[in-house]
Amino acid sequence: MDVFKKGFSIAKEGVVGAVEKTKQGVTEAAEKTKEGVMYVGTKTKENVVHSVTSVAEKTKEQANAVSEAVVSSVNTVAAKTVEEAENIAVTSGVVRKEDLKPSAPQQEGEAAKEKEEVAEEAQSGGD
């Protein structure tokens, strides 16, 4: 009977030791898993922030390109409208064609200057 008690006692100590080692192993594994999950979460967050920043920058660039195109189109339409209005005024006899010549180069110069200002503003990001 003592042999059985001693044998079971030794076995019990072995099981307790194994449980302690297993508990320690599980705890370490849980710690490492937590670290891994936190690392992935942090990197994912960084990548999301980077992606959002990239998308925002591209959107800003596209908006600048569109606004530049719109301003250019509006300037073209305005110039054509003035040109046609002048043609109508000349054709109807309200003004003489010679009276319109000096203002045309001046308007073109102003349009070119305005185009330059718009391009500079688009390059600076609208600031």
Swiss-Prot record:
Disulfide bonds: none annotated. Phosphorylated. Phosphorylation by GRK5 appears to occur on residues distinct from the residue phosphorylated by other kinases. One of its GO terms (molecular function) is cuprous ion binding. It holds the Pfam family Synuclein. InterPro entries: Synuclein, Synuclein_gamma. The keyword Repressor does not apply. Residues 97-127 are annotated as: Disordered. It is found in: Cytoplasm, Perinuclear region; Cytoplasm, Cytoskeleton, Microtubule organizing center, Centrosome; Cytoplasm, Cytoskeleton, Spindle. The modification Phosphoserine is found at residues 67, 72, 124. GO terms for cellular component: axon terminus; centrosome; neuronal cell body; perinuclear region of cytoplasm; spindle. Its main location: cytoplasm. The keyword Cytoplasm applies. Residues 20-67 are annotated as: 4 X 11 AA tandem repeats of [EGSA]-K-T-K-[EQ]-[GQ]-V-X(4). GO terms for biological process: chemical synaptic transmission; synapse organization; synaptic vesicle endocytosis. Keywords: Cytoplasm, Cytoskeleton, Phosphoprotein, Repeat. Sequence repeats lie at residues 20-30, 31-41, 42-56, 57-67. Belongs to the synuclein family. Plays a role in neurofilament network integrity. May be involved in modulating axonal architecture during development and in the adult. In vitro, increases the susceptibility of neurofilament-H to calcium-dependent proteases. May also function in modulating the keratin network in skin. Activates the MAPK and Elk-1 signal transduction pathway. May be a centrosome-associated protein. Interacts with MYOC; affects its secretion and its aggregation. This is Gamma-synuclein. The gene is SNCG.
